[in-house]
Amino acid sequence: MPNVKLPDGNVKHFEAPLTIYDVAHHISPGLAKAAIAGRVDGVLVDTSYLIKEDCSLIIVTEKHEDSLEIIRHSTAHLLAQAVKALFPSAQVTIGPVIEDGFYYDFAFERSFTPDDLSLIEAKMHELAKANLSITRRELPRNEAIQYFKDLGEEYKAKIIADIPENEALSLYRQGDFEDLCRGPHVPSTGFLKAFKLTKVAGAYWRGDSNNEMLQRIYGTAWADKKSLEEYLFRLEEAEKRDHRKLGKALDLFHFQDIAPGMVFWHPKGWTIYQELEHYMRNRLVDFGYQEIRTPQLVDRSLWEKSGHWANFRDEMFVTETENRHYAVKPMSCPCHVQIYNHGLKSYRDLPLRLSEFGNCHRCEPSGALHGLMRVRNMVQDDAHIFCTEDQIQSEVAMMLELVQSVYKDFGFTEIKYRLALRPEKRVGSDDVWDKAETALKLAMQGRNIEWVDAPGEGAFYGPKIECSLSDCLGRIWQCGTIQVDFSMPARLEASYVAEDGSKQTPVMLHRAILGSFERFMGILIEHYAGKLPLWLSPVQAIVLTISEKQNEYAEKVRKTLQKRGIRANFDLRNEKIGFKIREHTLQKIPYLLVVGDKEVENCQVAVRTRDGIDLGVMTIDTICDTLTQEIIRKGSI
């Protein structure tokens, strides 16, 4: 009879098989009432799961880390049940859990409207309030296919037809609705208390643009209403901060159908871009990098040698001229090896740090493009370090120092690190992998960095560190990468003469900090809601006149600011000063310098910030010094 080991180490002995719900009830009726699911010997199962043998058990409640995925998956089924109740001719397809929520795809003769979503959500609340029991049963594959065909659910039958014949399938029923699912699910619909449908969009069946278009309804679900409200607030804030809206409102950039996924930078947006590049260039010089430039169009022979032609061909833009095939480079790594290979290298030349603001193109699907966050033409802050195995740790430690310093200057202090470790299929010996993984760990320990191991998630050619930023809304953005590469240098015949005179292959370290300039700018715009730090603002100060009598003085102030390296402008229009202040505040200009007759007489300016703070009257030299010091301090403000 089963002995059940609980998380606190206690072992409960039972005289007969029993369900997880029964175990919870044995501990306390309150726990039984709160139980959502269980984890038996590490596997998530329903509370109705029958325990027959000795096992370890964790009872999952709303407070457990596993609860949200179960709640969201169950809510996706609740959505499908509501849609079928309101629109019986709709066919169900798939309904997975995604970050912060779920979606469900439906085949329906028309697009769902916002009014439809309101009706569906109301029906979901009705079904949740009914507290319908959720039960599980198994069916053989062929029976399941016929079952769904009889229901008129052709898409579901097609999904099951792709499953191996000998596999038993589980179905979950709630009320008169039953759906295919591995589970687990909450015990009843009454556990689903806090959810919201967020939007509807089109989606191709099985993600193939050659297939029919389905209707995808997105939603979010949480354990309680407070968490839901907090999430919806963050969602509302994210909508306000959408870099695409702010890019238009602040006249930074735009996109056009004539060049999908490629940015048209306006003067102010390009100013920010140039400031980013200037900043990164200076930091790289400080850390001993040599900047290079490599071609945009490269013969396919190089991509074949590097392995990109076989594995990345569909994402490359390819052209043909004079009977030769070329690819627009999707990444800079193979070209950097060509520069390394130009001339004999000795161990004394290592480490060799090469950097490039690499202009890359990738043929991303049009449906995946998303403002600056997902583009086809991006500039990456690429760097490749060629070194010996013994130099990996010191080089990675130096990279981490640079990563932390750069992110701090941009105002990001909460960084998450992930170490992707060896996969099953890999190149290189275990000894080499041991050495590389240990070097990465020691480098992070040396910087007092905490990280999460990701076993099996490294590339086949080496382990890597992923660096992710947390923005003001708590969203995580993976930007930086430090990747060890044992493969490409050998594939492209890179070598150096070792101290003993032998010919050796260097290790190649791929390194990016921003990731791509475009995406990083999108992150910055949303993080700061367009109110970029002074040093990044395209216009740092604007001089506003009260009347045309101050025009000459305003020009003098602007020129003085510009001579001090401050990006300044003026507004001489014959408009009320309140109108000017409001307009330039909406443009997120950090400092508004108002000049009237009194300021002209005393060679001063009245200083206001974009947040409406009155800093009083200052001399021109004082405001120049104030702004210059703030610019120098960068993200530490």
Curated annotation (Swiss-Prot):
Keywords: Aminoacyl-tRNA synthetase, ATP-binding, Cytoplasm, Ligase, Metal-binding, Nucleotide-binding, Protein biosynthesis, RNA-binding, tRNA-binding, Zinc. Its cofactor is Zn(2+). Its EC number is 6.1.1.3. Residues 1-61 form the TGS domain. The keyword Metal-binding applies. One of its GO terms (biological process) is threonyl-tRNA aminoacylation. It catalyses: tRNA(Thr) + L-threonine + ATP = L-threonyl-tRNA(Thr) + AMP + diphosphate + H(+). One of its GO terms (cellular component) is cytoplasm. Residues 242-533 are annotated as: Catalytic. Zn(2+) binds at residues 333, 384, 510. It is an enzyme of class 6 (ligase). Gene3D superfamilies: 3.10.20.30, 3.30.54.20, Anticodon-binding domain, Bira Bifunctional Protein, Domain 2, Threonyl-trna Synthetase, Chain A, domain 2. It is found in: Cytoplasm. Binds 1 zinc ion per subunit. Belongs to the class-II aminoacyl-tRNA synthetase family. Catalyzes the attachment of threonine to tRNA(Thr) in a two-step reaction: L-threonine is first activated by ATP to form Thr-AMP and then transferred to the acceptor end of tRNA(Thr). Also edits incorrectly charged L-seryl-tRNA(Thr). This is Threonine--tRNA ligase. The gene is thrS.
